[in-house]
């Protein structure tokens, strides 16, 4: 819909506010031919990006950050309306986006190769862009996750075609307006950045298949990630996918702190966070105390209007998603789960639920992506690690213990992309390597690491010198 510097404005897809359920926008849905055209335009502009000096790439990113910074409140409010995220959490997303843009700008000037000693002459390497980056993003962090792809892509001199989720596309449209403005100010052809809104099954699918795309940078569900991986064939692909992130609580830890951390992180964005707590594995000696604190903390949470500054939990992205969570709770209970609090649904809102489960329960096996905190009692750390590793996922794990030697041993044993000690799994800094193993993904994000993924190493050897 923003292709080659022109906006294509149609009313193809209705976008809803997940809290009021009102239709807030109608957006363009590109068909396959239009998507192919958007990719072709991006491809035609790749040399322009490649030839932009590091200073210019730096300047684009810093200027985008400057404009975003002057509209922080507007962007935070837009995220809350688009996604249903509580406003205090949306503000954090905007701040993190600014960090991601500035870090990307830094790396635009920091791209460097190396020299290799050789008796045959001089060997050195250069970092080069890949060409066209096809960025596909999910609904839950529509600004920050888009920037985690756009920022490093620009820093490394790639042109970009972005497909934001049609469930929450508005923020990406406003971000594109800023990028358009900055490119115009700097007299850079707008076709270096194109926004392809529409349905993922058409637009995202075409991006993953199209031969003019050099790399697909995808964040979203395992199911779509697998389809992208098949379609992409020889293209470079990074996949940031879902998980059932375990949090292990051992008896020697600060139990109150662990309970507070579990509740605070589990119910962020109504549980719609890829590194949300999947299940808490608690040593049996402390499970009663832990559960008591968890219930106390859960009762304090305020459910409701995302625009209210006191709200802790807003709606899920749609009534259908909330219904899915309601049904999951029913299934968990039918399998022996004990619902301790919450789980009541009203349209897209679900009150925060805490459930005691065992290892065979559905909630121990899947990514819920909703406000359910399952607690599972374990005999000891060995059993906790076995349950944690008996999973098809491997994104992040949390571990509470006051024994550093044990913590290091368990960190080695856990088959996860990131281990958070004395924290829930829900921790991410924009400059740390981030990504999963097993079905949770392929490759790493985190600006420096995405810069690596989005650039190619060229080796030059000078003989006879
Ligand atoms: P999703 O349904 O997989 O959608 C993600 C993106 O893929 C959207 O832009 C979607 O477009 C597009 N898409 C849909 N079908 C496609 C296809 N066949 N080919 C190519 N693209 C396609 O995920 P979501 O519901 O938006 O987000 C939730 C998931 O994302 C969860 O599993 C969560 O764990 C994961 N996630 C992971 C991370 C991470 O960094 N590891 C971060 C955030 C979220 P449409 O929406 O228009 O269909």
Swiss-Prot record:
Keywords: NAD, Oxidoreductase. It comes from the Archaea. The lineage of its organism: Archaea, Methanobacteriati, Methanobacteriota, Methanomada group, Methanococci. It comes from Methanococcus maripaludis (strain DSM 14266 / JCM 13030 / NBRC 101832 / S2 / LL). SUPFAM superfamilies: ALDH-like. NAD(+) binds at residues 220-225. InterPro entries: Ald_DH/histidinol_DH (IPR016161), Ald_DH_C (IPR016163), Ald_DH_CS_GLU (IPR029510), Ald_DH_N (IPR016162), Aldehyde_DH_dom (IPR015590), ALDH-related_metabolic_enz (IPR051020), Lactaldehyde_DH (IPR053404). Pathway: Cofactor biosynthesis; coenzyme F420 biosynthesis. It is an enzyme of class 1 (oxidoreductase). Belongs to the aldehyde dehydrogenase family. Its EC number is 1.2.1.22. It catalyses: (S)-lactaldehyde + NAD(+) + H2O = (S)-lactate + NADH + 2 H(+). Homotetramer. The active site is at 240, 274. This is Lactaldehyde dehydrogenase.
């Amino acid at each position: 819909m923003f292709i080659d510097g022109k906006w294509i404005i149609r009313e193809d897809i209705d976008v809803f506010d997940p809290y009021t359920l009102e239709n807030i926008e109608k957006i363009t849905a590109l068909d396959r031919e239009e998507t192919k055209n958007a990719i072709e335009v991006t491809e035609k502009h790749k040399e322009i990006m490649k030839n932009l000096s590091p200073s210019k790439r730096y300047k684009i990113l810093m200027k985008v950050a400057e404009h975003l910074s002057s509209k922080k409140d507007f962007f935070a409010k837009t995220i809350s309306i688009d996604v249903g995220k509580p406003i205090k959490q949306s503000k954090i997303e905007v701040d993190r986006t600014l960090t991601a843009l500035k870090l990307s700008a830094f790396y635009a000037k920091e791209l460097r190769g190396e020299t290799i000693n050789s008796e045959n002459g001089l060997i050195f390497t250069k970092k080069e862009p890949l060409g066209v980056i096809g960025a596909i993003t999910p609904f839950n962090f529509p600004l920050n996750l888009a920037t985690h792809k756009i920022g490093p892509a620009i820093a490394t001199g790639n042109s970009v075609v972005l497909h934001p989720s049609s469930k929450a596309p508005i923020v990406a449209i406003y971000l594109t307006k800023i990028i358009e403005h900055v490119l115009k100010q700097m007299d850079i052809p707008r076709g270096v950045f194109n926004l392809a809104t529409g349905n993922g099954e058409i637009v995202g699918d075409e991006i993953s298949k199209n031969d003019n795309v050099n790399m697909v940078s995808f964040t979203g569900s395992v199911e779509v990630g697998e389809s992208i991986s098949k379609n992409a064939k020889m293209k470079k692909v990074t996949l940031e996918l879902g998980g059932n992130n375990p949090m292990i609580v051992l008896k020697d830890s600060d139990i109150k702190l662990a309970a507070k951390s579990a509740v605070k992180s589990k119910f962020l964005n109504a549980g719609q966070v890829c590194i949300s707590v999947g299940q808490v594995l608690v040593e049996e000696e402390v499970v009663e105390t832990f559960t008591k604190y968890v219930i106390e903390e859960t009762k304090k949470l305020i459910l409701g209007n995302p625009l209210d500054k006191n709200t802790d939990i807003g709606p899920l992205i749609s009534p259908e998603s909330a219904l899915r969570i309601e049904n999951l709770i029913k299934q968990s209970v039918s399998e022996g789960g004990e619902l301790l609090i919450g789980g009541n649904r009203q349209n897209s809102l679900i009150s925060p639920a805490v459930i005691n489960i065992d290892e065979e329960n559905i909630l121990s096996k899947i990514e819920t992506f909703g406000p359910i905190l399952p607690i599972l009692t374990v005999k000891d750390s060995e059993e906790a690690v076995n349950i944690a590793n008996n999973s098809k996922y491997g994104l992040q794990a949390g571990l509470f213990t006051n024994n550093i030697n044990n913590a290091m041993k368990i960190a080695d044993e856990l088959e996860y992309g990131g281990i958070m000690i004395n924290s829930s799994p829900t921790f991410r800094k924009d400059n740390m390597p981030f990504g999963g193993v097993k079905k949770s993904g392929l490759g790493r994000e985190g600006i420096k690491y995405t810069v690596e993924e989005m650039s190619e190493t060229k080796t030059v050897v000078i003989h006879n010198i």
